[in-house]
Amino acid sequence: MKSVNREIKLWRALGFLDVLTINVLSLISAGNLNRLIPLQFSYIDKLGHILFYGFASFCFCKMAILKSNNSSYAIKWIVAGLLLMGAILEIIQYLSRMGRQFDIWDLVANGLGIFAGWALSILLPSK
């Protein structure tokens, strides 16, 4: 039981660290983002959305699976929360004057990542 609690804490910490990273990367100016991540190839932005949202989903879903035998209720809220967070961040980008803009394809990439993370959390067994 102690190792399960430790694993739950690990997934929770990694998930919140990832959510913090998503928020920072989403809310810094376009110029600062380009200096921070100088990679310039087609769709690097979408790949980032898939990977970061996928990892957050994986971490929180893994945590929910470890905490409860009936994790489907929690997982629905995790998925909904991450989708909502992505939409709110896109709206903030649209309303801000930081050189960032709303992109529906970012929301699609977020959703793909979230559902991939959820699926992997189910398919990959815990220790």
Short names for language-model regions:
Residues 1-63, 78:
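"…centered on the first transmembrane helix and the immediately adjacent amphipathic helix/loop
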Residues 9-10, 70-77, 100-104:
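Membrane-helix interface segments
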Residues 15-26, 74-95, 111:
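Small-polar-interrupted transmembrane alpha-helices in polytopic inner-membrane proteins
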Residues 28-29, 65, 97, 125:
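Short helix-capping/hinge motifs at transmembrane helix termini and TM-loop junctions
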Residues 34-36, 87-112:
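Interfacial helix-loop-helix junctions of multi-pass membrane proteins
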Residues 40, 44, 81, 85, ...:
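Residue-level marker of motif borders
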Residues 52-67, 112-125:
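Membrane-interfacial alpha-helical segments at the cytosolic side of multi-pass membrane proteins
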Residues 81-85, 105, 122-127:
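Extended, folded domain segments that form the structural surfaces/walls around functional sites
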